[in-house]
Amino acid sequence: MSAPIPAAVPSSDALVLASIANGIGTITLNNSTRRNALSEALLDQVIAALDDFKTKEVRVVILRAFEGATVWSAGHDIKELPQANQDPLGYSDPLERTLRAVRAFPAPIIAMVHGSVWGGAFDLVASCDMIIADETCSFAITPANLGLPYNTTGLMHFLGRLPINLVKELFFTAAPIKGNDAYKWGIVNHLVPSAELEVFTTDFASKITKKAPLAIAVAKEQLRILTDYQPIAAQIFEQLQEMRRTVYDSKDYTEGIQAFLEKRPAIFTGK
């Protein structure tokens, strides 16, 4: 049994901590004051860590929150979303860039989850190759709470991983899927007791480091291409974009963002 990789301790020095041990790269979300909100600065550091790991031929990556975090990540940093008349989740959005980096990284990435995962952080975790979690885990996708139009790529990520009825429940209710239910639905690969999470994840990652890295890299890329291949006519794509535009141009979107920033319940009118 392998010793667990030392957990990072939250500090104000870095939003993300990165380390390598025994062929395993560990990326630790480290912004305790903002509950690991996915700000552009934090996500840029995640991408930089992945780029560094690639040059050092890391065999597997563990993506985790700092030790003791009860919220794995609060999701998008709402303060950075445009308040009206701009696509909040466009192709160049920092989270979208990070998701592409995670999915294209040549080695497996394991999300190790202790605590709750909200909004865009669920998309980040789901874009990892595997999820190992403990009984404290929960997963919620929350655009309905904000009046936010989720992008088509994000919807396709979830449809590629989960049954459509569960995707609808997640998007329509914004209610968290917890522990055993997350395992039952296949959101997580392994659900283990909290006390065993780090050792189990490290042992699991260690097994991968002993396998053929080129074969794994090619299999991962093949699977990415096959699952991403969803031919959509240009006319249909434009129609989907226009539907989203009606949301981010709406009063409801402005109200949802303002209500969140003002820490009050949103009053949606459907306009």
Residue ranges and their predicted role:
Residues 22-30, 41-86, 101-112, 130, ...:
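A structural preference for short, pocket-lining loop segments at secondary-structure junctions
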Residues 1-14, 258-271:
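Terminal low-complexity tails and localization/encapsulation signals of metabolic enzymes
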Residues 98, 102, 118-171, 185, ...:
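CoA-thioester-processing core
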Residues 82-94, 242:
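A short acidic, glycine-rich active-site loop
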Residues 132-137, 188-238, 267-271:
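C-terminal long alpha-helix characteristic of the crotonase
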Residues 129-130, 169, 173-175, 181, ...:
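Well-ordered beta-strand positions
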